[in-house]
């Protein structure tokens, strides 16, 4: 009830404060110059933009002293622009198609004559935006319905955008969550995708704020935009932003149903001899996939109240290639049950409605609610099914929004809006009745392969990741200026518990126990965040030049409430006071861009943009500083199972070596010591402490002929202000270097047998002594260093997944002809350098510290087409040629192998020596970004047939064919050097992606409209 009251209070506050636009950061517009027959500018001309997409029917402006006009905040749609002035004939421009975020240059040439005389001009829609500098891809609902898009999702933007990476998918077979999740997406080396609905952030509040729980229903999408650069000061995005522009209904009732279906019999087997040689017994198989949307829209009251509603039922079930259930579950052994293949199953139920109400001539209210339940059984990761994220029940969850738009005059516009994204992500221990897992089953990791079985590493009964967002803005528009200022505010709630079966995990090496991990579970952490941003910007047209400039002031604040924990097996009862300002960061972020209409005809534009963007953050930064987490929640100790009973025969509460167990590797474990891990107070507050990136772009856009345009560009980004972790109890002098000889293997460089040096082990006297401080990285930089990244931070967030320096080039073409033919695509390539060559604690940090991702690893070719055929047939398709993933060889070297070079046993051994010590160290046998899998080529096709059932009822029959060539490209392999090295496995780092491209898939679909 407390959250409900808060939600209602915030909604009321927003409505009383001001008003909000549906277009937000992707506002469209029409602008231009009005002239007379002699070429002189005409002030005082009334310019009206009319469209069925506007519930108010028409928006207007008046040209200024330079003859310029500017109509902003228009919805996507088809417009008629009318120019009228006493003493001149009225001029109409018809068929102006606006996409989201596009400003169409529509100039008016007026002749002397009677006002009643109307001259109608029908011409091609402008394709070059000479006003804006943002780099964006706009995908309309019409285009998605035309192309082979499977279960329509955010992944479709990745398929159509050269340079964008994401989850490989064949007709929706990768699942509902992964095709809608932004976590795996990057663009030109940048990660941290912000997903917005109607201009408001809807991602979960936990972690770095880059994951989703709520799944947008694409039936509501009029258009979806992807901004990849040149983003204005209005946006708090970290460099990449997706925004769904929702449908509103209209003055005509429309009803319909969209559906698709496929089954196991329609999915081809693509198992090849090459895959069998890699140890693959079977590839992934779609058992069923369905998606049904029932939609309705129209007027509740014509010209006043519109509605649009959609009810979605969708689901999928797939086998996971090469993986089986455990026939000996509940024992220390994994025995593949060849009669039970691992599977992944998901289903979603969603019911949503949007209402748009023209309150008065100047005020418009929009309300949206979508309540859904999303369910998951199995993840498809490289783990035994019993140890995967087994039973996600994301219910109830949903998205609830309200916005108000107030056009005070043809120059003044007020906007405001509010959103409540309810994201839940619990994955509880499933119990003995589900997938045969008992709470007594201990999670086991086989170190030689990286394979986990018997139980999940950790479980969560509570994962609340709620996000509340608000925004407001004021726009003042003249013919030459579009001034806008306002703010966005977000509040995040993240409650998450942690449970571990038996409060321990086991690690085996080739079936022999060698490590036990202890946890202070169960516990519940509470984290909170607030993100506020204020901006001011202007778009200034000076003859052919348009300047876009603005400034943002961002303030990110995280805190945790008071928390109490009961005593657990390995920890005493603890109480912690509330902690504020962890961190409290302020930043000033300039944005600048310029667009020059080279010939003054709106057909060629030269563009430049530069901006400072902040790392994406969520409540995870509060979690880092939460005193519960800072007290050390888990620690490792070696384990020599001398009696072979697969149970650690030692006193685990004794942190010193005893029985079969060595000493704990962190002496803070189990103690009430919130200072064991902490942030340097100097970087927790103030200006400019947050990691940021600069992003610049130069582009040339040219309309080759009516209906065809091309873009060529150069793009560069780099990040700065890194954080790093310093264990203040040790120095580089406390480490001893060693080398390891690589195994002899023809698959290794030179056949193996070479030495890998640069490894280091801490002195035994310092083992377990930890006092970690997260601090600025730059004091550790050597003179003349070229550091572009560190191990803990990057513009994508706290994990440094996308930091460094990137240079990219892009050439793309887009066309749409009056005949209905559409063609598009492009080539994108680039190079990324990540340099982390500095030492904080261990000299080993210099090993492979400079990584270059070459052009060949980032060159993409993408294209799409759509051709109307006779008899209401249509043929369309997409093609992608993408680079293969990189892979490495991480070798778990034993103490015996290491001691030869180290001159002693590893520090983790304690009093054990030689083979009696089961400690290991991971040795990288291959330098990152030097070995790659084969490139992937994927062709998807669609054939449609329009059928007129009655005068009002139409059916479109759809036949889709995905992965036409039945390619079996390997997408990810095991990078742990051992018996399973280079075997195709799911990429667990991004939630498990199919290791092999699924085979040819046939889908049947239909769209019914009346």
Task: Label each region the model flagged.
Residues 154, 167, 179, 562-589, ...:
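Solvent-exposed loop/turn elements at secondary-structure boundaries
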Residues 556, 711-888:
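Gram-negative outer-membrane beta-barrel transporters
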Residues 64, 88-248, 267, 274-285, ...:
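Periplasmic N-terminal accessory/gating domains of Gram-negative outer-membrane beta-barrel systems
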Residues 662-669, 673, 677, 779, ...:
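Extracytoplasmic gating/loop element in the C-terminal half of outer-membrane beta-barrel translocons
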Residues 2-140, 201:
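Periplasm-facing N-terminal accessory domains of Gram-negative outer-membrane beta-barrel systems
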Residues 969-1010:
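C-terminal beta-signal and terminal closure region of outer-membrane beta-barrel proteins
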Residues 254, 284-375, 393-420, 590:
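Transmembrane beta-barrel wall of Gram-negative outer-membrane proteins
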